[in-house]
């Protein structure tokens, strides 16, 4: 996800909004930005404010939600970012998702690209958080089991009737950037469209181990070069 975002802002075609919709949020670490609050935390704050009656007088719940939403929007030089985070108390994400959906509706026209990093369950896309998905990237490691897991996600996307403009598979961390015959056979077995293959990259691995943002690696990095070619081939 971080590398894709890096490629988009590097092209300078317009502003990018990043939505980290994975409950185990860490995309900000890949991008090298600090997260002070998440929409999950805001949900808890709003619930407590409503319970204790501390929503400012003269301010509706919707106004308060919009104000708090602004607190969660991270504005970086290269992109803006929202983190869904996790809810700590009981209850569901329904209201937070509603806030996210309504606020995104207001913010979307300001961005050329919106990139959402999802959990495998695709809950936020299924709930209509985004009005339409132009490109769905399915990411798997270079293993048969990884491809099988992605194939199940592809089935879910079809069952949900999401109909993205284009959808395809990117294989990550392939030794020497090459597919094993067994993995290729598994891809063909499930009828998955292969967008491309990314090589195992020692520099990316070191960034992960050392806690450094891999998106800041030089443009000559092998994984960045490979991803740039894939994105050009699919019109991004």
Regions found by a protein language model. Give the residues of each.
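Cytosolic-facing regulatory segments adjacent to core modules
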Residues: 60-76, 80-116
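Glycine-rich phosphate-binding P-loop
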Residues: 1-2
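Conserved beta-strand scaffold positions in the cores of enzyme catalytic domains, especially
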Residues: 18, 79-81, 194-197
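N-terminal phosphate/diphosphate-binding loop that engages ATP/GTP or pyrophosphate donors
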Residues: 6-77
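C-terminal alpha-helix
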Residues: 226-236
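C-terminal boundary of histidine-terminating zinc-finger modules
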Residues: 210-221
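Residues in the short beta-alpha loop(s) of Rossmann-like NAD(P)-binding domains
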Residues: 21-24, 173-175, 201
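Conserved catalytic-core segment of NTP-binding enzymes
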Residues: 95-197, 206
